[in-house]
Swiss-Prot record:
InterPro entries: PRC-brl_dom, PRC_barrel-like_sf, RimM, RimM_N, RimM_N_sf, Transl_B-barrel_sf. The keyword rRNA processing applies. The gene is rimM. Keywords: Chaperone, Cytoplasm, Ribosome biogenesis, rRNA processing. GO terms for molecular function: ribosome binding. This is Ribosome maturation factor RimM. Residues 95-178 form the PRC barrel domain. It is found in: Cytoplasm.
Length: 187
């Protein structure tokens, strides 16, 4: 049983599929059928899973793992999250403006004056675009859009994100707040 130093979530196992130990898997990889290309997958409890076969369906992939040979063994895996070591991800395949979610977590979000708005504690995609979760000491978590207008620059080496606090919704736009205080009347 191996504990990963820098785990990256790759997939979540769903329901069993058929009688031969196959499972439905929600893959978080760019190409869902490439799930096995990153090496063995690991669970948080230290189990190791070798992918033998992957086939694509409409919303998930169907996966067969070594040692999971019947439906009851497959059913026992339902809800299990699978990880790989961060070093197994191919950095050279990324464009200049592409990042792995795992690389963004822990970066400090600062504005142009150096004011900190917290650190990235999560990256989410609920369907309308990526969101970064920021959490600072003594602050509640806040979600900001991960867009070129909100996040102006990413410096992985310095561990910082340069954000526009107005575009990110972290502060109120002074011009808009004046409009709210003195609404115009319509005739």
């Amino acid at each position: 049983m191996t504990k990963l130093e820098n785990p990256v979530l790759m997939a979540t196992i769903g329901a069993a599929q058929g009688l031969r130990g196959e499972v439905r898997v929600k893959s978080f990889t760019d190409d869902p059928t490439a799930l096995g290309d990153y090496g063995n997958l690991h669970s948080e409890d230290g189990r190791v899973f070798e992918v033998l076969e992957v086939r694509e369906t409409k919303n998930v992939v169907i996966v067969r793992f070594r040692g999971i040979n019947d439906r009851s063994a497959a059913e026992a895996l339902n809800g299990l999250e699978l990880f790989i070591e961060r070093d197994n991800l191919p950095d050279d395949d990324l464009d200049e403006d592409e990042f792995f979610y795992a690389d963004l977590e822990g970066l400090e979000a600062v504005d142009g004056t150096g004011k900190s708005y917290g650190s990235v504690t999560g990256v989410f995609d609920f369907g309308a675009g990526d969101l970064l979760e920021l959490k600072g000491p003594g602050r509640r978590p806040v979600l900001i859009p991960f867009t070129e207008w909100s996040v102006l620059e990413i410096d992985l080496e310095a561990g910082k994100l340069l954000v526009d606090p107005v575009a990110a919704g972290l502060v109120e736009d002074k011009d808009e707040s004046l409009d709210k205080q003195f609404p115009t009347k319509r005739k």
